[in-house]
């Protein structure tokens, strides 16, 4: 398991077998359980290391947790509160980090914006699309542009 502080990305959490009893950073009681968690240079009961927002047990939701602004967070809540992926290449609006996106080369798009930029046809899974002059094109518009000489013959 890992803790990531997005500012430095340092892995900091491991599951360790119980040795000498340690005090829990969450409840301040001795840890008598067989296993304990170590995060942020402190020891925790498995039940005490929880997301500050949704209260989920961080040892159960994955192998990564995040810290920021003195909060310990699961991935979902960290991204909801602090994350962004950048701007959509089609509409230029901000894309929240937790939102599903489509990517074409270095461009990132909202799912609703991932469409042919000439005819606005949305793509389905498996549809062929072309990236030409940094524009997303359906096969029909791309081929028409090739026939009309709008594009050179090299597909990007």
UniProtKB/Swiss-Prot annotation:
Name of the protein in question: Rhombotin-1
Tissue specificity as recorded in UniProt: Expressed in the brain and not in the thymus.
Biological function: May be involved in gene regulation within neural lineage cells potentially by direct DNA binding or by binding to other transcription factors.
The keyword Metal-binding appears for this protein: yes
A biological-process GO annotation: positive regulation of transcription by RNA polymerase II
SMART domains in the cross-refs: LIM
Species: Bos taurus (Bovine)
Location(s), subcellular: Nucleus
